[in-house]
């Protein structure tokens, strides 16, 4: 019997994986740079803080990594507050666990 459920939001509950690439691409575009596929591949194995240091160095940006990270996180936060949608069937699935009084986090 299931005793509890721990969810991973990105890509499981929410259709949200593309926002990180969009936020990074926008951050670079505002500085006249283009996010390439190889950088995307490398960045997705990093934490956001590591990623901001990586793009600062790789693209020779003058802004501090903390400024880049803040800009990226503002865009990601806007997405979660205003645009993120549950993946198909998620609401019913979660409601089913709730109806069975199974704790979720």
Regions found by a protein language model. Name each.
Residues 21, 25, 48-53, 65, ...:
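An amphipathic alpha-helix signature
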Residues 36-37, 52, 88:
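Short, hydrophobic secondary-structure boundary micro-motifs
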Residues 55-92, 100-102:
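Metal-dependent phosphoesterase signature
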Residues 1-42, 99:
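Active-site neighborhood of HAD-like aspartate-dependent phosphohydrolases
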Residues 17-18, 49, 91:
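Alpha-helix N-cap/helix-start capping motif
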Residues 45:
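N-terminal phosphate/diphosphate-binding loop that engages ATP/GTP or pyrophosphate donors
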């Amino acid at each position: 019997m299931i005793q509890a459920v721990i969810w991973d939001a990105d890509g499981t509950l929410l259709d949200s994986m593309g926002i990180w690439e969009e936020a990074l691409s926008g951050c670079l575009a505002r500085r006249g740079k283009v996010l390439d596929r190889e950088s995307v591949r490398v960045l997705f194995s990093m934490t956001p803080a590591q990623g901001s240091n990586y793009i600062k160095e790789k693209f020779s940006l003058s802004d501090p990594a903390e400024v880049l990270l803040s800009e990226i996180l503002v865009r990601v936060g806007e997405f979660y507050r205003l645009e993120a949608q549950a993946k198909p069937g998620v609401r019913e699935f979660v409601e089913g666990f709730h109806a069975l009084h199974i704790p979720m986090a």
